[in-house]
A protein has these predicted regions:
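A short, polar/charged loop-to-alpha-helix boundary motif
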Residues: 52-66, 191-209
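Active-site beta-strand termini and strand-to-loop segments that position acidic
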Residues: 41-42, 77-80, 178-179, 199
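Short, structured patches in soluble enzyme cores that scaffold and shape functional sites
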Residues: 25, 39-41, 51-54, 78, ...
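Glycine-rich acetyl-CoA-binding "A-motif" of GNAT/NAT acetyltransferases
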Residues: 33, 46, 183
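Short beta-strand scaffold segments in enzyme catalytic cores
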Residues: 23-25, 36-39, 75, 174-176, ...
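CN hydrolase (nitrilase-like) catalytic-core segments centered on the catalytic cysteine
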Residues: 2-22, 83, 89-194
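Cysteine/selenocysteine-centered motifs that mediate thiol-based redox chemistry or coordinate metal-sulfur cofactors
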Residues: 72-104, 204-227
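Short hydrophobic alpha-helix segments
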Residues: 43, 49-50, 187
Length: 227
């Protein structure tokens, strides 16, 4: 990982700009490949790595051909500016991801993403995708920051992908919500953009205590979730 080009670039940039960066990269360990995120602190140091838990497999997202399900568990990284939980793409569709990170002390939820519209099915999943994460914010009283790529990508038939052919238009639409799920900042579908927002983490922590959502949880009643 120390030699990964994206991670090394992220470390230099984080140190230069004094920012925290979750950097996506492909991680190899012996014979296993993982879809991973390296969390880099504002001094350029590596805080830790999260390996994607949920691995999709359908006509457009063929990750099970390549990636092993992550073994790190959900991670929360204690950085210079706060505690951040990071899920990767398909992880964002599972409420368990957000709740586990919240229970581990996250103050902000990040979801680096690569998702798009499927021309063959004439399907635009963007509104559903966005509402799903707005729900995570509202249920955990925690801001969500989701970054999605843009552009078109063609997949040609080959042995490695089982002879499948498809194309995907990544629809961008990155966004930031407040702790109730309300959209504060949104990006376009086809342009590179930078979104910024300011949060008072102490104020947000006080709101979570006031609502009592975590106080009133009853984990012994949730056995079905782990079956």
């Amino acid at each position: 990982m120390e030699e990964n080009e994206a991670v090394c670039w992220g470390q230099k940039l984080a140190k230069e700009l004094k920012v925290v960066l979750p950097i996506s990269f492909y991680e190899k360990e012996v014979n296993n490949l993982y879809n991973s995120v390296a969390c880099i602190d504002a001094d350029g140091d590596l805080v830790g790595v999260y390996r994607k838990t949920h691995i999709p497999d359908d006509h457009y997202y063929q990750e099970k051909f390549y990636f092993t399900p992550g073994d790190t568990g959900f991670r929360v990284f204690d950085t210079r500016y706060g505690k951040i939980g990071v899920g990767i793409c398909w992880d964002q569709w599972f409420p368990e991801t957000a709740r586990c990170m919240a229970l581990e002390g996250a103050e902000l939820l990040f979801y680096p993403t690569a998702i798009g519209s499927e021309p063959i099915l004439a399907c635009d999943s963007m509104p559903h995708w966005r509402r799903c994460m707005q729900g995570h914010a509202a249920m955990n009283l925690m801001p969500v920051i989701a970054a999605n790529r843009i552009g078109r990508e063609e997949v040609k038939p080959c042995v490695e992908n089982g002879g499948q052919e498809s194309s995907l238009i990544f629809y961008g639409s990155s966004f930031i919500t407040d702790e109730t799920g309300e959209l504060l900042q949104t990006a376009s579908r086809d342009q590179e953009e930078i979104l910024t927002e300011t949060f008072d983490l102490d104020e947000l922590a006080a709101k979570r205590l006031e609502w009592g959502l975590f106080r009133d949880r009853r984990p012994k009643c949730y056995g079905k979730i782990t079956e």
